[in-house]
Amino acid sequence: MKKLKASEIRQKYLDFFVEKGHMVEPSAPLVPIDDDTLLWINSGVATLKKYFDGRETPKKPRIVNSQKAIRTNDIENVGFTARHHTFFEMLGNFSIGDYFKQEAIEFAWEFLTSDKWMGMEPDKLYVTIHPEDMEAYNIWHKDIGLEESRIIRIEGNFWDIGEGPSGPNTEIFYDRGEAYGQDDPAEEMYPGGENERYLEVWNLVFSEFNHNKDHSYTPLPNKNIDTGMGLERMASVSQNVRTNYETDLFMPIMNEIEKVSGKQYLVNNEQDVAFKVIADHIRTIAFAISDGALPANEGRGYVLRRLLRRAVRFSQTLGINEPFMYKLVDIVADIMEPYYPNVKEKADFIKRVIKSEEERFHETLEDGLAILNELIKKAKATTNEINGKDAFKLYDTYGFPIELTEEIAVQAGLKVDMTTFESEMQQQRDRARQARQNSQSMQVQSEVLKNITSASTFVGYDTATAQTTLTHLIYNGEEVSQVEAGETVYFMLTETPFYAVSGGQVADTGIVYNDNFEIAVSEVTKAPNGQNLHKGVVQFGQVNVGATVSAEVNQNDRRDIQKNHSATHLLHAALKSVLGDHVNQAGSLVEADRLRFDFSHFGPMTNDEIDQVERLVNEEIWKGIDVNIQEMDIASAKEMGAMALFGEKYGDVVRVVNMAPFSIELCGGIHVRNTSEIGLFKIVSESGTGAGVRRIEALTGKAAFLYLEDIQEKFNTMKSQMKVKSDDQVVEKLTQLQDEEKALLKQLEQRDKEITSLKMGNIEDQVEEINGYKVLVTEVDVPNAKAIRSTMDDFKSKLQDTIIILASNVDDKVSMVATVPKSLTNNVKAGDLIKQMAPIVGGKGGGRPDMAQGGGTQPENISKSLSFIKDYIKNL
C-alpha cells in the first residue's frame, strides 16, 4: 500500500472520480445554508439533500466531494479514543438516479487496489454486506473475485433513518495485521467488530427503498448511491500509524502543543488525552469560525464555546494556564491550506475571536473550579450526586458548560442531578442552549414539483407587470387542472415579474388575474427545477390551467424593496471602510419597510462610527451613481473586484451589481437604477445578536424621513417641557438639570453617611484583633450598592491600619467590599478575602490586593460569610 499524505489521498480520490464522469461539488461551509434542520453540516451527503429529495436537479447525476463536517453528539469521547473527532473530512461519491451497485462496488475496488491510486493489497481487504443483499454478494464474489470467507454478512448493514430513503450498505475493511488490536482483550477481532486491526475504510450505501409512514418499504423511483470515506482514518491506514492523531493532519499541531507545554506526546496516557482534545477542538473551532460561526450562549455558538472551554480545561493538565489556543490557528491553516484556503485568509480574525474567548474563560475558570471542587466534596460526603440547582448556578453564573461539570464529576466517581438541572434550564429559557433535534440527511422524495420541467422565465428585473400563461396548479400536494375560490394554491407562469425570496430579499406580492378569477399572491419561492413557484389565495372565480393572465407586482412595495436592497450594498461597503476588512455579512433582511444587516465585528460600534457609516452611505446616495448590472463569468467578476458574500455558492455565470467605485457585489436581487432613488438613509439601531455579530437596522426614503420627523416632534415636546425657545438652549438646560441632580445626590449621600455613622456608633470599638491583625468585619445598612463604597472610604480614613470588610443587603442583593492596608498586602490580599466570601452568598468577586469587591444573591448568608472570613484570617 502506498504511503500518502492526507492531501494526496484527498486529491487522488477527487481525480479518480472525475475520470469516472463525476462532477466535483466544492466543500460547503460548516454552517448550513438554507437548511434550518441542521446545526452543522455533519456528513458528506448533508449538502446534497436538495438533489436526493428532488428540490434541485444537479448539472450531472454523478457527484464527488470532500466535505468538511462537524459532529458533536459524543464530545466526551474525544481524546479518549483513537478515532473520535468533532471535525472531520468525508470523501464521498454519489449517484443521483444514475449508476447503482455494480459500478459503485467496481469503482471502490479499483480505487483501493490499483497501483495508480491507493495501491492496497487485495488480500488485506474484507467486506460486510446485508444477509439478504444477494446482488451485492454476487458482485463482490463473482465479479470482483473476493473469496467467500472475506464477505461477512451482518444484519446491521442496512441504512435506515426512519421515514425517507433507505437501503442496504456494504462496508470495506483493511486488515492492518497482527500488530494491531491486541491492546484490549475485549476487542471483537473480526471485520465489522469493534477493534483496531480491521479498520473500516469505506461505506457504500445503496439507497433503493422508501421507508413509508406505515413502516412499509417501497422501491424508490430513482435509486441512488451515497458513499463515505473518512479522510483521517484512511490517512492513518496509509501512513501506518496507530491512531488518526499520529497522521500528518494532527502531528504539526501536537508538535506545537509540545513546545508550549514542555510535555511530550505519546509518553503519558493521561497527557495524551489532553493533546488529542486540544488538537481536535482547535480544528473544529478554527474551521467553524472561518465559516461564520461565533461563540455564543446557544445554538452552534454554544457548541464552540463548550469545545473551547473543554480544551482550555484539558490544557491545564499540561501545565498551560494562560490563553494559547489561538496560537495554534496558523498551524491548522498551514496543514489545510491546499484545499481550504479560507482558514489562512481569516486567520487574524479567528485568532482574535479565540483569544477573546480564552481570556474570558480564564477569568472565571478558577472561581468556577473552586466552587465545583466544593460541590464534589459535599456530594462525596452525602449522596454521591451533585445537586442540580448547584450545577445550574455554576453554568448560569460562571459560564461552566454542564457537560464540563458532568465530565469532571464522572472523573471524581460522581453523577449530576440532571433532572433538576433541566428543570432549572426550562425556567430560564432565555439562557438555555437552543434545543436541537437530530436531523435526517434526506427527506421523502417529492415527485410532483420535481417532475415539472417546463420553463418559467423571470422578467421582473425589467418590469413589474406581465401578460403570461398559467401553466401548472398544485393543490393539496397534487397537480390539478382547476381550483375554486377561497382555496390556497401554488402555481407557475410561463413568464413572471414576481421575485422569489432569495439572498435576504423578501418575495414580491401582488395579484394574478383575468376576467374570470383573481389570485392574491403572498409568497414566491424556487421550485426544484428553478422555476418561480407562486402561492396565493383565489379571491373569486375558478382558476384553470392554461389561462391567459395578467401578473402585477405591488409596485409601491417593490420600489421600497429596491431602495432598501441597494442601500444594503452601500451599507456593507461603508462598514468595511469604517471598521475594517474583517467585516463580513452574517445575514440580511430586505423588506419594503426596513432593512436589517448582520455583520461580523467585535463590540458595539461607537456613535462616531455609526455617524461615519451613515454619512458615507448618504454621500453615495446624493452622488447619484448609476447602478450598472451585468451578467458575466465568475472569473471576470472577481477580476473587476466584485465582492462575493461569504458562505454563498455561485454558478458559472453571476450577476454583478456595480455602484463603482464604492460598491461592486455579486447579487441576484432587484435594485434601483440610480442611487439617488434611495433618497435618504438612516440607521435606527445598532445592537449585538451574539458574540462577534452586530446588527444594524435602517430605513430609507420616505420611511427614513417619517422617522426623523417623529424624532423632531419628540424633540420639540422636550423643548416645550424644558421651557426653552431655541434648540441650542436644550443642551444647556439639560446640563443645568444634571448638575442640580448631582448636587442633590451628593447632599443625600452625605446625609446617608451621617445616618449610617449614627447607626454604627463608634467604629473603633468594633475593631477586633485576629491573628495579629486589626480587623473590622461588619454588615452595614446602606440605601444602595454605591453607598457601601463611600462608607468604606469613610471608615478607611478613620482606620488606616485596619483590614476592613463590609457587607450590605440592598433589595435582596448582597454587596461586599474589602480593603487591606498596603503594608499588609504581602500577607493578606483583599481579592482573596472577597473570593472566599462571595460563593457563600451565592456570588463572585475579586480585585486588587489592597481593594476588592463582590456580590451575591443570598443575603440570608451574610452573617455566615462574615463569620467564615474571620476564621479564614485567623488561620492565615
Swiss-Prot record:
It catalyses: tRNA(Ala) + L-alanine + ATP = L-alanyl-tRNA(Ala) + AMP + diphosphate. One of its GO terms (biological process) is alanyl-tRNA aminoacylation. Zn(2+) binds at H565, H569, C667, H671. InterPro entries: aa-tRNA-synth_II/BPL/LPL (IPR045864), Ala-tRNA-lgiase_IIc (IPR002318), Ala-tRNA-ligase_IIc_anticod-bd (IPR018162), Ala-tRNA-synth_IIc_core (IPR018165), Ala-tRNA-synth_IIc_N (IPR018164), Ala-tRNA_ligase (IPR050058), Ala_tRNA_ligase_euk/bac (IPR023033), DHHA1_dom (IPR003156). It is found in: Cytoplasm. Binds 1 zinc ion per subunit. GO terms for molecular function: alanine-tRNA ligase activity; aminoacyl-tRNA deacylase activity; ATP binding; catalytic activity, acting on a protein; transferase activity; tRNA binding; zinc ion binding. GO terms for cellular component: cytosol. Consists of three domains; the N-terminal catalytic domain, the editing domain and the C-terminal C-Ala domain. The editing domain removes incorrectly charged amino acids, while the C-Ala domain, along with tRNA(Ala), serves as a bridge to cooperatively bring together the editing and aminoacylation centers thus stimulating deacylation of misacylated tRNAs. Catalyzes the attachment of alanine to tRNA(Ala) in a two-step reaction: alanine is first activated by ATP to form Ala-AMP and then transferred to the acceptor end of tRNA(Ala). Also edits incorrectly charged Ser-tRNA(Ala) and Gly-tRNA(Ala) via its editing domain. Belongs to the class-II aminoacyl-tRNA synthetase family. This is Alanine--tRNA ligase. The gene is alaS.
